[in-house]
Amino acid sequence: MTTINHTLGFPRIGLKRELKKAQENYWAGKISQQELLETGRELRARHWEQQKQAGVDLVPVGDFAWYDHVLTTSLLLGNVPPRHQNPDGTIDLDTLFRIARGRAPTGEPAAAAEMTKWFNTNYHYIVPEFQQGQEFKLSWTQLLEEVDEALSLGHQVKPVLLGPITYLWLGKVKGQVFDRLSLLQDILPVYQQVLAELAKRGIEWVQIDEPALVLELPAEWLTAYPIAYQALQGQVKLLLTTYFDSIGHNLETIKSLPVQGLHVDLVAGQDDIAQLHESLPKEWVLSLGVINGRNVWRADLTAKHQLIKPLVGSRTLWIGSSCSLLHSPIDLSDETALDAEVKSWFAFALQKCEELALLTAALNQPDGSKQAELDAYSAPIRARRESKRVNNQAVTERLAAINPQDSERNQPYLQRAEIQRQRYNLPLWPTTTIGSFPQTTEIRGLRLDFKKGRVDGTSYRTNICEHIKQAINEQERLGLDVLVHGEAERNDMVEYFGEHLDGFVFTQNGWVQSYGSRCVKPPVIIGDVSRPEAITVEWAKYAQSLTEKPVKGMLTGPVTILCWSFPREDVSRETIAKQIALALRDEVDDLQEAGIGIIQIDEPALREGLPLRREEWQSYLDWAVEAFKLNAAIAKDDTQIHTHMCYCEFNDIMPSIAALDADVITIETSRSDMELLDSFENFSYPNEIGPGVYDIHSPNVPSVEWIEALLRKAADRIPVERLWVNPDCGLKTRGWTETRQSLANMVQAAKRLRESVK
């Protein structure tokens, strides 16, 4: 039996972020839709060929998306929210963008669909909306067209399709409450039609993604799997594909399904492959996800080979990435500035394809002729363990010296709140922003010139100070109560801090997609983390010197830095988080000593870091909360600690949110129509809350009346004296014109509400 390999998906964005640039140029009216479509065709063709040349046997098709693959599935099924539908009922590319962004180059603006995290990753998907009685039909043939493209180019094609149960699981009911699982019988005919079309094209295998099978699903959802897959069997072979965790707890359901293969994630999951082999039907393909699709580290192919070798010859095996390579940068060979030793520790998406090819070749040659090549490839991993770049004795000793008091504020919240009220004397409904202001071409150019050495340090600081002054002046003109310095010096909220902490390295082109056209370049944590000098104090102190109003110091929290970086694999996530917390603890102390009395520690990734299995939640939450408190607890009683979170379902982690003991929490709520506040109301959350009153991911400017209505809904749930007024998130990606208009309306809404309670 010959072992073959495949990937579950490949990055869409292009090595130079070509897709992002084409999307944004199209949205700005700078290129035509035809030019955008051509960019997509070029990227797909390039990526298929690159995988083939790297040695991938089955090329995934259908992993490309114009915004998000879940949204693509919604269009495939004809699931378009009524507010986004074209008058004639047709679906086009602008329909897709209107759902995701709230507007498109054609069509009237309408509230964007909700966006949330894809399982426990930093990728976001557009949440499907379901209404009772809605109809589904094959309406968007992108998958079929792309399969035709790939076939015409001579590739061995494996279409990728998000499975029906996971699709329904990921969505939300809008309007009248009903069980969205009841829609299964309505969407299955569309899936049948798609599979029939693929069969007509001679497709043998379809990768049907059901990552919901790694979750602890309710019984009725598990029961739906046999129903769904009985309906889908027979037209093509189905590779039931799971990832992000193990599937042992759902194995009885899985092995009863009429599919022809199963893919398991052996990186994030802990499934015993010998047990899987014994449990699964002998005729099934067992696809082993042994190459990590979510990191940048070179694989220990010697160890992987030893793991898989005992199964060779006993059943048909495929070797694959643990999940889609969407979460990995594209090509390490493009990194010309990385230190050679550090570079030898890494593998990006294309290198992971090459790892699959080498591992497959070794498994197909049982005489051991590839063993030396495997060992040579894996040698840098062993060398890394002893590297001085990795180990810092001072950090180890400081971590060991932590005591319980280091994580506790001096006074409880109620006493602190009174002290802070006396210091700041803020009005009811105090207004603020989340941190960043628009990153103009001028600002980005300045940072690039400084990085390239075209601008010296003195000139750079002078220019950044001018941008800070502009941000302060804009906020004072608008009438905001608590100001920010605007973060002109920051490229990314995680990358910026990583650049100033020991233990991190950075890539030139290590971009990954976060959502739509939003790409991030995560730092890589390669060793013990420490802070050699103050990071933000200079800018915050200057901003505060320009105004009598309080200016917030802005930090990214330890859990978010961990979650939004590529972490080490040789120590626990808890250890890394606490190392970062100790480094940022020193920053909090330096800020307050410099006169900064309000300090925001952003933790948007706190919930994202949760394990997918609920039984593992509490252990994670305990150390995540401890890391935040270790970061913040050095603050004096009159120093007000804010935190910010977004895209969260808070209800099931409210005790941990409260345990953070932040004086103020600001959250993303506008897309959910303030529903997220229900969790805080039901829990009787004791501290102050700033519910986001407008969606910064959409260019739409909210009206005063819209914001006022949302704030009144908030006041129905939270006492007015504990409410703040702010946007959902930072304003980095917005333009100044819409930012001024939106913030002016926000301030005006707050003033109206103050008048109404006099």
Curated annotation (Swiss-Prot):
Q: In which pathway does it act?
A: Amino-acid biosynthesis; L-methionine biosynthesis via de novo pathway; L-methionine from L-homocysteine (MetE route): step 1/1
Is Transmembrane helix set as a keyword in this record?
A: no
Instruction: List, in alphabetical order, the Gene Ontology terms for molecular function in this entry.
Output: 5-methyltetrahydropteroyltriglutamate-homocysteine S-methyltransferase activity; zinc ion binding
Q: Where do the annotations place L-methionine binding?
A: 434-436, 487, 602
Keyword annotations for this protein, in alphabetical order, are: Amino-acid biosynthesis, Metal-binding, Methionine biosynthesis, Methyltransferase, Repeat, Transferase, Zinc
* The UniProt record lists the keyword Repeat: yes
Sorted alphabetically, which InterPro entries does this protein's record hold?
Answer: Cbl-indep_Met_Synth_N, Cobalamin-indep_Met_synthase, Met_Synth_C/arc, UROD/MetE-like_sf
Annotated positions binding Zn(2+): 644, 646, 668, 729
Q: Which residues bind L-homocysteine?
A: 434-436, 487, 602
| Active site residues according to the UniProt entry | 697
Q: How is the cofactor bound?
A: Binds 1 zinc ion per subunit.
Q: Which Pfam families match?
A: Meth_synt_1, Meth_synt_2
Q: What class of enzyme is it?
A: transferase
* Catalysed reactions listed for this entry: 5-methyltetrahydropteroyltri-L-glutamate + L-homocysteine = tetrahydropteroyltri-L-glutamate + L-methionine
Q: Where does 5-methyltetrahydropteroyltri-L-glutamate bind?
A: 17-20, 117, 518-519, 564, 608
Q: Which cofactor does it need?
A: Zn(2+)
Top-level lineage group: Bacteria
Coiled-coil residues are: none
Query: What EC number(s) is this enzyme filed under?
Result: 2.1.1.14
What NCBIfam families does the record tag this protein with? met_syn_B12ind (TIGR01371), PRK05222.1 (NF003556)
Q: Which family does it belong to?
A: Belongs to the vitamin-B12 independent methionine synthase family.
Functional note: Catalyzes the transfer of a methyl group from 5-methyltetrahydrofolate to homocysteine resulting in methionine formation.
Annotated protein name in UniProt: 5-methyltetrahydropteroyltriglutamate--homocysteine methyltransferase
Q: Which organism is it from?
A: Photorhabdus laumondii subsp. laumondii (strain DSM 15139 / CIP 105565 / TT01)
Q: Point out the gene that encodes the protein.
A: metE
